[in-house]
């Protein structure tokens, strides 16, 4: 793979996400891919772990996705009693940190449990050209923020191979939440390249 360029698309964090998107000239090529991270009911208003104004990112991503031939969606997909849930650690509360075999882990409220409406993609997310959904965080004893690799830094999700097989050289990353899953996806991508904010 040659150079890869990463764009962390932080639209929901801004006061006016649509004007931000309009101000950025994103010109994908045939060897570009858009990775849409965790735009799920659990991470928007009314969900179990909501990102403030999370739904504001959806129309921006819908519009952006129409420009790409290659689109991948990720989905947080936890088992009940997942190791990252505070409820799985007696006497612990959500947002406390604990040390686990793979490193420090923030404990979360139960969220994005497999097969529940909370784990579903937001219904207004409309990306019919998406070719792949990567489910992450489904190993009960390992959390996963990155779309590429679980938090143990060993277990891959399959996304790297998918992008290499398609000879993708430019990756744009969008979604929820920029402080965790979007950030980790951007930082942990195993492909060489540059980060553009």
Task: Locate each region found by the language model.
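Active-site alpha/beta core segments
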Residues: 59-170
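N-terminal export signals
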Residues: 4-22
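Glycine-rich anion-binding loop/nest that anchors nucleotide
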Residues: 168-184, 197
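Acidic/histidine-rich helix-loop elements
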Residues: 44-53, 146
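Gly/Ala-rich phosphate-binding loop of Rossmann-like dinucleotide-binding domains
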Residues: 190
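Residue-level marker for buried hydrophobic side chains located in beta-strands
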Residues: 34-35, 73
């Amino acid at each position: 793979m040659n150079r890869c360029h990463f764009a962390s698309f932080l639209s929901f964090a801004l006061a006016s996400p649509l004007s931000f998107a309009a101000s950025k000239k994103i010109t994908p090529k045939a060897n570009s891919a858009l990775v849409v991270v965790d735009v799920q009911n659990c991470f928007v208003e009314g969900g179990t772990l909501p990102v403030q104004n999370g739904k504001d990112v959806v129309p921006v991503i819908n519009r952006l996705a129409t420009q790409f031939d290659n689109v991948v969606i990720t989905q947080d997909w936890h088992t009940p009693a997942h190791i990252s849930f505070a409820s799985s650690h007696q006497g612990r509360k959500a947002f406390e940190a604990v040390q686990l075999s793979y490193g420090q882990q923030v404990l979360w409220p139960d969220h994005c449990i497999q097969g529940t409406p909370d784990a579903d993609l937001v219904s207004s997310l409309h990306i019919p050209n998406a070719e792949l959904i990567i489910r992450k965080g489904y190993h009960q004893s390992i959390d996963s923020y990155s779309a590429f690799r679980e938090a143990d830094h060993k277990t891959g999700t399959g996304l790297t191979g998918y992008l290499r097989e398609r000879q993708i050289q430019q990756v744009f990353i969008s979604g929820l939440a920029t402080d965790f899953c979007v950030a980790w996806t951007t930082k942990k991508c195993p492909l060489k390249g540059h980060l553009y904010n």
